[in-house]
Amino acid sequence: IDKEDKGKEVIDKEYIHSKGQYFTKHESLQKCVIDFILNKPKLILEPSIGRGDLVNCVSDKLNVEFYMCEIDENIQLLDGIDRNKVLYCDFMKIKIDNNFDTIIGNPPYVKTKKGNLYIDFINKCFNLLNDNGELIFIVPTDFFKLTSAHKLLSEMISVGNFTHIYHPNNEGLFEHASIDVMVFRYCKDNSSEKITLYNNETKYLIESSGLITFSDTKINMDNKLSDYFDISVGMVCGRESVYRNEELGNIQLLSNKDTYTKYIYIDKFPSKDDKINEHLL
């Protein structure tokens, strides 16, 4: 690669990262998206088609129409994608009057002040689902852990369930990036038990204040730890034999129910107390 090509490659990578454009070229991800389409849609929304990888692979298997959006007009579309049918726009800013039985996508992964753009895409698409509609997205695995996603996840679980998840445990599925991703199928149907087929294994989905975890066994979330235990926040001083001192201690900490223990607390050394200074030497 000559200097000019190297410079172009650096610019291209910077552009790709700034836009969060990681195209779905890997066949395992494409196949999973197709397999997760369990409804029989006539029209599928794809809010960020990129080159059109997902549209092409789904069109090869299913006879459906697509509502296609893309913000970047500079992307070279794949053969088979009709440019005239692509709505070039900022998906987050346009109003869509339709609701959909099926929405698929690989949204942009771009950090924002409030979290990440892919979470905003999920939020908007969730609200564009019909009852019993399915949302099938490829996203970073941190989606279930991010504080910025807790409110959305809590709302989604209140009216539906993540029925299928494919986690390939492979960070090399995109060019120019190492990202741990998963494919999820969410169904806006709250009539069934919160069971998830996770990498083809049956798991029980647990949602607590927007934090999603999975268990091999069913867990009763109606009872709290406080129903069984007295819970207190502990304190570790680092050296009990030095800082725990009934004579020189200047703060009291709850060490047991109705029992307090005195500890030495200073924010700098030497302190204003000569006896404490001598003790700590």
Q: What is the predicted function of each stretch?
A:
Residues 10-35, 42, 48-230, 236:
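Signature of N6-adenine DNA methyltransferases within the class I
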Residues 217-281:
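Polybasic, glycine- and aromatic-enriched phosphate-binding surface used to engage nucleic acids
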Residues 1-8:
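Long recognition/docking surfaces used for binding and targeting
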